[in-house]
Amino acid sequence: MKKKSAKNEKDRIKVFSCEQPDEMLAFLKKRPVFRELKYPYTERMLKLLKETNPFRQTYHYIESGESFAFFIIYESRMNIMTLGNSEWMMNVKTVGFPCSLSNSGYVTNDLEFLLSYCKRIKGGKLILNVDEPVEMKGLGFGETLPSCVLSIKDEYRTIDDYVASLRSQYRRRIRLAEKRCRDVSVYRVEISDAGMKNDSWDIYPLYLNTYRKSEYKLECLDRKFFEESEGTRLVFVKDDKPAGFVLLHEEGEKLVFQFCGMDYECMSNTADLYFFMLLHIVGFAIEKNKKIIDFGQTSELTKMKFGAELSKRYFYAHHTNPFLNMFAILGKKLLEYRYDFPDFKVFRRG
């Protein structure tokens, strides 16, 4: 643990940094605005990620006048041009949530204050999954992977109501996936508060399969995360073996699609299985009276064919080396995620 203060032009910046999430959360609870940090910034989630994410994670709080920020930094050696489909490996400190969710890795009332402080941190930095960006000089800026969000309409009482609301070509695609997955059984597994798994299916190899095929690799979580992460697991079983799974988390009126995994050799066309899995996520959300599904990032085209809309996310990049920082500012096209998806017009009119 380390405590320190630094000066800026107006006020002293109070800084509290530590290595353990429970220590940071105990500190934050003394501040009224942080007494009830919501998912995913819960003690259980942060402690589990500390154990299961191999990257070094540190926790930071800064305050100056009315401005404050809590943020997480994880350190890794990464290809900073992954989104631009090039390669340049660099040691990077990422202000981000330490698993592949669409959430940012900070809570603040003043993003400009947070960014100004991050510019002082030595080395290369990325601030990921910013949803409401501000203009800030001296940093690279661009789009990262958007989050896919599906709104669940009030008239959807059953999954059949949802499917009936789709235009014919999208209904046909879903029905085809159902037909081709008719020998796939679906099991629902609840992970209790105690983190006790109550099924015998080993889904971790499926997660590793999908991780290895991912174009945008970040962290690779340990098995323990999937055994103890609180939520609901849907397991898709074919020939008495798990063919796929999804890990879901309920947060108020929102359902969060956290992770998935597949056996890519179990079917001749795994796209059918993926459609089938997404359909069951929609059905689960309707059953649980959710208003929104956060389908997360990646696989945008498939999720858009279910009616999901894209919620933009942005990044900032900075390096204390002036030459490298100039590249971060001017090399936007090499760093950012570029996309041009069609408007599928998934739903029927009226």
Show where each model-derived region lies.
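Active-site/acyl-donor-binding loops of N-acyltransferases
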Residues: M1-F16, E75-S76, M136-S165, K238, ...
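Short, high-confidence coil segments that cap the C-terminus of an alpha-helix
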Residues: F55-Q57, I121-G124, G231, K288-K290
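Non-catalytic accessory segments adjacent to catalytic cores
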Residues: S100-L150
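Alpha-helical elements of Rossmann-like donor-binding domains used by nucleotide-donor carbohydrate transfer enzymes
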Residues: F113, D202-P205, H280
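Conserved acyl-donor/pantetheine-binding loop and adjacent beta-alpha core of acyl/acetyltransferases
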Residues: I73-G105
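A short, internal acetyl-CoA/4′-phosphopantetheine-binding micro-motif in the GNAT/acyltransferase core
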Residues: P98-D110, C260-A271
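A conserved beta-strand-loop-helix scaffold within acyl/acetyltransferase catalytic domains
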Residues: K3, D11-M81, N129-N269
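Aromatic (often tryptophan-rich) hydrophobic motifs at membrane interfaces
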Residues: Y216-I329
